[in-house]
């Protein structure tokens, strides 16, 4: 809440209302009501954007020699990474720990559109459709059956409140790790990391249920229609040991 805004208190009032409207949007299937709520969300988002300092985090990282700022998500982890000049370790640690203490989910609407674009980009390829269906059946009822980027239905009904609950559950120190590589003095760096990243909530590591995969009942087939005539694709999956 200290990075990316000129007035967080005023911005937060609007962001809280936006979160409530997203919950209401997810709770209704009425087309007229959904259109009405989407218009309200859009109007509020425009007002909230007036308090935003675009890309301030990126610029701060770059100011201190940082490059290749990016993030990635897989089935079991989310990672954030970039390179930076070692003489700026103090600034780097301050900036990166700050965003994990109390993140603000601003510009959610535009970020959601970016996710939609990525979903559609991969969904238009033949292999992606086949592999997604194979993975869905192969791992059911394990969470791996669910696509990493989310389902189309889920993306149509996003909830900022769920994002906040996810953060509070999983973004605790006991469930996180920090990896540094390069030319630096460990004895000099450790006190800096302890004074900055120790601000992250301790918390208990989230409980994870072990989901046993039921055996296949002989040979199973899943048919998938792809929007390309005269093209056939096949994917096979086998359980290992």
Residue ranges and their predicted role:
Residues 5-87, 121-175, 195, 199-241:
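Non-catalytic beta-strand/loop surface segments
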Residues 95, 192-196:
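Alpha-helical scaffold elements adjacent to nucleotide-binding pockets in ATP/GTP-utilizing enzyme cores
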